[in-house]
Amino acid sequence: MTKPRVAVMIPTRMRAPEFRMALKSVRDTSSAYVIAYLDDDVDNSAYPEMGYIRIVGKRLGVVGALNVMARYVMENMPEIQLIAMMTDDSLMKSPGWDEMALRAAHRFSGGIGCVAPCTNKEGAHRVDQPAVTRGWLSYFGHFAHPDMNHYCWPSVIGLLADGICLRRCTSEEWYIHHDQKGGGDHHFDSDSRAFYRWIVAHMDQHREWLRNYIGFGVRHEDACRLS
């Protein structure tokens, strides 16, 4: 039996019922592995014991947890080609989304790219809860930008990949429903400042480096044609 080639990372804190639903939604729609990061300063006894890879550690915030899980994938799961994420209050809704995303990812030159699910059927298609290729992680060295804690990091990925190696999925191809149960996070101001600094000081150069590294062999329109 072929091993799954997609992993879904879920940072979660004190939301065992929501996590169970998120885990079930991944199982019901794909063959992807699930990896969860749980903070060790709270009671996690209500979380399921089986059916996913469980990492317990100190509270790091969303960005820190994602990067720990991404590093685990890179070091321990060589078969994984696409690394996705979702919040613990989200649900995967599109059967076969993992195979569709893999087909899209295979069209990126050098194995470097981002596949962005649709997370808002009515509004603008911003990059949120993105998936990146193994090559992307090898190139950048992290999943979420380490200067941020909770917010803005998906937009960093979107701005880096846009027009170079970004595939935006339709709601029919890959839709993630986000319940937005969070009450806000106190890192918004600091994350916004870090995001602005990155745009002003680094975005253009990082995009140029990425474009030169892959030789701009990635044609956005080709990535959108699935065969």
Which residues are covered by each model-predicted region?
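Short, acidic, metal-binding catalytic loop of nucleotide-sugar glycosyltransferases
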Residues: M21-Y33
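Short beta-strand-to-loop acidic/aromatic patch adjacent to the donor-nucleotide binding site
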Residues: E79-L91
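Short beta-strand-to-loop element that shapes/binds the nucleotide-sugar donor at the catalytic cleft/hinge
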Residues: G113-D128
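C-terminal catalytic/acceptor-binding lobe
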Residues: S155-S227
